[in-house]
Amino acid sequence: MPLAEPPAAAGSLNEHPPRTLAGTELVRVWRRHLPNGTVRASPWWFAAATADPYAGGRFDLSAPAGTCYLAQTVAGAVLEALRVHLANLPAAELAARGAVRAEVPTGMPPAADLTDPAGVQLGLTSAVWAGTDRPLTQRWAAAFRRDGWWALHGGIQHDLTGTLRGVSVFDQAGGHEPTHAGPWPLDEIDLLDDRTLVELADVGVVLRGPGNLPPAPTP
């Protein structure tokens, strides 16, 4: 079923089914080491929509607002950061990234649950996270923010299992901690440890070291 345009009337999404975030843990993965040598120590970045919507994230908002993308698991956060499913992930690509587990503060309002079947009545389908129409998904994000939502809970585009869940948090654009819910305590995650690699393998992503060519496709 195709994704429809979001409702135009203000307040149309006020009563959309919520998903509690307060007291849960989310994972954020970001590019810590940039190609030019710059190191981004902070995991927080709220991206505003660009002139080319396909250059940004599916739920980016128009400036001065922005969106930060997290997930419920490490594997989900890696796929969100990569924006692609790599069956053979170069180790250097993962090593260039940082990861933290964030404790969501008790003051964080619930997210609009995009996975709830009730959304179908408004034309909302899984294409809002699995599809490729960035302008349309960004319009849905703007409609949810218009109607008072501070976050979205949904699937992850490049998750081949269909089981991973992401959370997109809205705030002012730029590099800063979320401002509307108090401190977000962080714990560092080692993306190259065995536990992480097993979790990635479970969703079809296998790390490839330097010089290790990916397997040839089966004829």
Map each language-model feature to its residues.
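Extended catalytic/binding region for NAD+/ADP-ribose chemistry, centered on the ART fold
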Residues: 56-88
